[in-house]
Amino acid sequence: MSRRYLFTSESVTEGHPDKICDQISDTILDALLTQDPSSRVAAEVVVNTGLVLITGEITTKANVNFVNLARKKIAEIGYTNADNGFSANSTSVLLALDEQSPDIAQGVNTAQETRQQDSDELFDKIGAGDQGIMFGFASNETPELMPLPISLAHRIARRLAAVRKTGELSYLRPDGKTQVTVVYEDGRPVGIDTILISTQHTATIGEITDEAAVQAKIKQDLWSAVVEPVFGDIDVKPNDQTRFLVNPTGKFVVGGPQGDSGLTGRKIIVDTYGGYSRHGGGAFSGKDPTKVDRSAAYAARYVAKNIVAAGLAEKVEIQLSYAIGVARPTSILVDTFGTGKVDEETLLELINQHFELRPAGIIHTFNLRNLPSERGGRFYQDVAAYGHFGRADLDLPWEQTDKAELLKQAANESLSAAIAQALT
């Protein structure tokens, strides 16, 4: 008997209060790494009505104007009208910054493997910036090897922002959320159950002043200008049974930091796989690459995506764990959920042979310290909204599948060797 079930993921627009914070944090990171690639950064941001607080720990040789960086990013997002209770020019920006703890720095600067003279390898010189667990995931249900629900939620959120910025739907405002419920049958997406969009808007639209009429206009426009274009190249499409919900409270005029406070690192499921895979709990934004919350999560995605791209599993989840001040992972776990074409022990061997998972090695593989300067001063801020994974619109090193053929060949060789041994 086939199993039919629903799975839901959400996304938010760049104007959501939490995402404002993520983007300011990563704008600061970009600026610091551009001037000083060795900067140690843990930049946290809080926003509320008329207020931005930048706090955290930063050790750097760079000289940047944090206040100007925050205002510029807020304006880029679209908050330029003081009447909305939050705008680039009128908001107060407060700073409360310290340097990185020397107790932490000594373990990052010189890993335990080097301090105890257990290794003289280059990649053993830098220790993990903290303990923790990180997950990476990939699935073959979309071309970008991401789960369909989060992929659709991001697409709708990005399209929602696009029609606002181009003026196609000029009454929209920056804050917004999306949610998509996908119908699955035997583990494969077969339909769209529900599409939800909550979007900030003006109180009236032209001469339309009645609240119900305003919402009817928004719903009609969002279907034609946002939803239909998103599903144009998607095989699984909404039908006449699909529920389409828009601003279910009845209106969404008060939004952004005036409606809700925001905080860096509060949208970690939106940033990753939409709940389809497990999450270790660590946020990404505002953290330099020595923080394995970020860099190791990127590495785990890279491993998972290459395994699926190689055809060795239909979906796979990778767990990594680290100890603060230690270079080598304390554990690696592979789970193919029964979809593997080779056993998980073989996949673990392939990971150990072909992927570098020490922090210094991850930084080197992805060039994480130099990407901001090489890309005109902005890199991390562009992944701070609409997801860090599956981004076909961005050239992200951890999204490359350059090891897929190598893994496929190595897996075939391992299988041939196992067969030969069994026959002797």
Curated annotation (Swiss-Prot):
Catalysed reactions, as listed in the record: L-methionine + ATP + H2O = S-adenosyl-L-methionine + phosphate + diphosphate
Species this chain originates from: Nostoc punctiforme (strain ATCC 29133 / PCC 73102)
Protein name: S-adenosylmethionine synthase
Positions that bind ATP: 16, 175-177, 251-252, 260, 266-267, 283, 287
PROSITE patterns: ADOMET_SYNTHASE_1 (PS00376), ADOMET_SYNTHASE_2 (PS00377)
Swiss-Prot/TrEMBL cofactor(s): Mg(2+); K(+)
NCBIfam families given in the database record: metK (TIGR01034)
Enzyme category, top tier: transferase
Chain sites annotated for binding L-methionine: 57, 100, 260, 291
Protein's cellular compartments: Cytoplasm
